[in-house]
């Protein structure tokens, strides 16, 4: 029977399945951070259980860390406790930890792929909703809760029901300057923030195949923002070339054997999806969210929508509420909306290609008066590479703040946050009320668009910046 990529990955990992029971899956990789792991390790301790497969468990610090100092005390008592607990737990249970002083420390979803921990064909879990990022490699990767974190630590397995399947095909070639962030925001604009609920999404089409691995990670990172369980891109030569030579990737003949298997991880001809969505890449322009969920998104050259234009009463009410929170009036051009802060970073857009794209706009320009702009590399290696290329100097000369790796202003769990009423052009993945700080107003954009907002002081079409 013809199978989708998701069905192949799921079936290959079933350890046990019985009638009227949820299948038990084997988990190949478990990524751990300081926020969702303390109670899980305490559960192991209380029952006298070891970590079943410490060699398949990798930990780092990211959510709570300061991006201005490596001092564990910098972000408050709760952050300090969580990080110290992670140090203690990893030492006690034999788990590899990339702590604040480790050169590989960084955002968990940047670190995993970078170190070759993430490989095609794997099942990967983490106590974080944006674990979908790793689906870019043709891996079945999804976020789990703290009780599930404990279960995986103890057994290296997890009960998981089968999801429905969705194919999102982006046909044709994207125009110059259109990034994976624009593509995925356009997709969510079409499906809505709940359009993928109950599904695993496979992204395909020429525009998707043209993306680098970093672009594919941005794409899959935001699958969760359309309500999907996770996102997938089938592995190809782009994938294999990215993985080859990385720290935890197979070497020599083992790598060749792995590639031979990875090449089978494609949706079979004739396989059927429960839902199919199609977009034309050439119709996608730079995207900016205007509301309080990622589905409330328009082209940079559009006007703020009028809630009255929504036929669905639920969408109309949601738009009214969003505009009130965001302090926006219907009908005004988006390019006239001024910003207070800019955040370039997060597990969505903090990799080297993202920083290069932002630096290209920043070079030779200055951050607009009254704007604070942060650039936060996703990991130690990203920071080191950016500095080797001189990107840090470009940003600093333009008036951006060059920071240490961490989740930073994506979420208000550290010192980087918005004050009430502040408006931010952000390369992160969520624009919910209060996500970046109580009363903060978040607009999601690509790295180049964020840099353009920083130097102009308002939203601007990067295609017009020469």
From Swiss-Prot:
Signal peptide: none
Keywords, comma-separated and alphabetical: 4Fe-4S, Amino-acid biosynthesis, Branched-chain amino acid biosynthesis, Iron, Iron-sulfur, Leucine biosynthesis, Lyase, Metal-binding
Pfam families assigned: Aconitase (PF00330)
Cofactor, free-text remark: Binds 1 [4Fe-4S] cluster per subunit.
EC number: 4.2.1.33
Family matches, as CDD domains: IPMI
Gene3D superfamilies from the UniProt entry: Aconitase, domain 3
Catalysed reactions, as listed in the record: (2R,3S)-3-isopropylmalate = (2S)-2-isopropylmalate
Major enzyme class: lyase
GO molecular function: 3-isopropylmalate dehydratase activity; 4 iron, 4 sulfur cluster binding; metal ion binding
Pathway(s): Amino-acid biosynthesis; L-leucine biosynthesis; L-leucine from 3-methyl-2-oxobutanoate: step 2/4
Cofactor(s) this protein requires: [4Fe-4S] cluster
Residue positions binding [4Fe-4S] cluster: 347, 407, 410
Record keyword Iron present: yes
InterPro entries named in the record: 3-IsopropMal_deHydase_lsu (IPR004430), Acnase/IPM_dHydase_lsu_aba_1/3 (IPR015931), Acoase/IPM_deHydtase_lsu_aba (IPR001030), Aconitase_4Fe-4S_BS (IPR018136), Aconitase_4Fe-4S_dom (IPR036008), IPM_dehydratase_rel_enz (IPR050067), IPMI_cat (IPR033941)
GO biological process assignments: L-leucine biosynthetic process
General function of this protein: Catalyzes the isomerization between 2-isopropylmalate and 3-isopropylmalate, via the formation of 2-isopropylmaleate.
Entries under NCBIfam families matching the protein: leuC, PRK05478.1, PRK12466.1
Quaternary organization: Heterodimer of LeuC and LeuD.
Family classification: Belongs to the aconitase/IPM isomerase family. LeuC type 1 subfamily.
Protein name: 3-isopropylmalate dehydratase large subunit
Organism: Shigella sonnei (strain Ss046)
Gene behind this protein: leuC
């Amino acid at each position: 029977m013809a199978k989708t990529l998701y069905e192949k990955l799921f079936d290959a990992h079933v350890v046990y399945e019985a009638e009227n029971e949820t299948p038990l899956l084997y988990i190949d990789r478990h990524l751990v951070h300081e926020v969702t792991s303390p109670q899980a390790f305490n559960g192991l301790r209380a029952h006298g259980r070891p970590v079943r497969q410490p060699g398949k468990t990798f930990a780092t610090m990211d959510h709570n860390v300061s991006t201005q100092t490596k001092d564990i005390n910098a972000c408050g008592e709760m952050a300090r406790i969580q990080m110290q607990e992670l140090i203690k737990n990893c030492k006690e249970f034999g788990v590899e930890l990339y702590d604040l002083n480790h050169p590989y420390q960084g955002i968990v979803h940047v670190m995993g792929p970078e170190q070759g921990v993430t490989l095609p064909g794997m099942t990967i879990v983490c106590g974080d909703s944006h674990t979908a990022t790793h689906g870019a490699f043709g891996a079945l990767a999804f976020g789990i809760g703290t009780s599930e974190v404990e279960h995986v630590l103890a057994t290296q397995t997890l009960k998981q029901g089968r999801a429905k399947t969705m194919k999102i095909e982006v046909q044709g070639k994207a125009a110059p300057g259109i990034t994976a962030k624009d593509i995925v925001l356009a997709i969510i604009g079409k499906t809505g923030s709940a359009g993928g609920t109950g599904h695993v999404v496979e992204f395909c089409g020429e525009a998707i195949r043209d993306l680098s691995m970093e672009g594919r990670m941005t794409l899959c990172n935001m699958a969760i923002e359309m309500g999907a369980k996770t996102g997938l891109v089938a592995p190809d030569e782009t994938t294999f070339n990215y993985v080859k030579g990385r720290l935890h990737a197979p070497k020599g003949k083992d790598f060749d054997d792995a590639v031979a298997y990875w090449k089978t991880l494609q949706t079979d001809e004739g396989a059927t999806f429960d839902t199919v969505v199609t977009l034309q890449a050439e119709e996608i322009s730079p995207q900016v969210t205007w509301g309080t969920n990622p589905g409330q998104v328009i082209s940079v050259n559009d006007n703020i929508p009028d809630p009255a234009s929504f036929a669905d009463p639920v969408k109309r009410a949601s738009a009214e509420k969003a505009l009130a929170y965001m302090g926006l009036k219907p009908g005004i051009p988006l390019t006239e909306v001024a910003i207070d802060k800019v955040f370039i970073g997060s597990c969505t857009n903090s990799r080297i290609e993202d920083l290069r794209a932002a630096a290209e706009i920043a070079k030779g320009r200055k951050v607009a008066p009254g704007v604070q702009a942060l650039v936060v590399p996703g990991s130690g290696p990203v920071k080191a590479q950016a500095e080797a290329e001189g990107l840090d100097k470009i940003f600093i000369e333009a008036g951006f703040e060059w920071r240490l790796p961490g989740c930073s202003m994506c979420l208000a769990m550290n010192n980087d946050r918005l004050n009430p009423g502040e408006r931010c052009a952000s390369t992160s993945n969520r624009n919910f009320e209060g996500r970046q700080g109580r009363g903060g107003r978040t607009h999601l954009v690509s790295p180049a668009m964020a840099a353009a907002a920083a130097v102009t002081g308002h939203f601007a079409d990067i295609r017009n910046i020469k």
